[in-house]
Amino acid sequence: MQCPFCQHTDSRVLESRSAEAGQSVRRRRECLQCNRRFTTYERIEFVPITVIKRNQDRELFDRSKLLKGVATACEKTGLTALQLESLVDDVEAELQQQAVREVTSTELGESVLTKLQSLSEVAYVRFASVYRQFRGIRDFVEALDQLKESGDGPLPSVLDEPYEDTAQPTIMISPQ
């Protein structure tokens, strides 16, 4: 390791410890030429993953963008920030383990939906509504039917009954 002060290439390691939750190693070094101390970090180098969007544009995978989308879908669902971070960590780990360096936004979205399904039905439907570009109530009903068929969680029995509008029209007469 080259000394940042005198550019000498020999140094000795004084101390090593895990850093950043085990994602890197922090090393305290001493230059053998000038005897000054400096710190280095060793990190795992991940190969960048490219996301192919619907319009065929390509952009680098952005973990924070995915986390923001998931967090928006999970607002007021009771899921913790730690659960959301873990979900995004799992998706990112799956991407890194694949031999392919490009992934479609469809594959990415389906991976998120699979994980959300077991965490929160509400978050699942919210994320699906944006990701799958729901156009109307039928799209929501289809998503709810898929959840019901998967059997991963109880859905309200009200979905088993056809909707009937039993409200009577109200006529307001104002005095003149």
From Swiss-Prot:
Residues 167-176 have a biased composition (Polar residues). Residues 151-176 are annotated as: Disordered. A zinc finger (unnamed) spans 3-34. It comes from the Bacteria. The keyword Cell membrane does not apply. InterPro entries: ATP-cone_dom, NrdR-like_N, RNR_NrdR-like. The keyword Nucleus does not apply. GO terms for biological process: negative regulation of DNA-templated transcription. Binds 1 zinc ion. Residues 49-139 form the ATP-cone domain. Belongs to the NrdR family. NCBIfam families: transcriptional regulator NrdR. HAMAP family: NrdR (MF_00440). This is Transcriptional repressor NrdR. It comes from Acaryochloris marina (strain MBIC 11017).
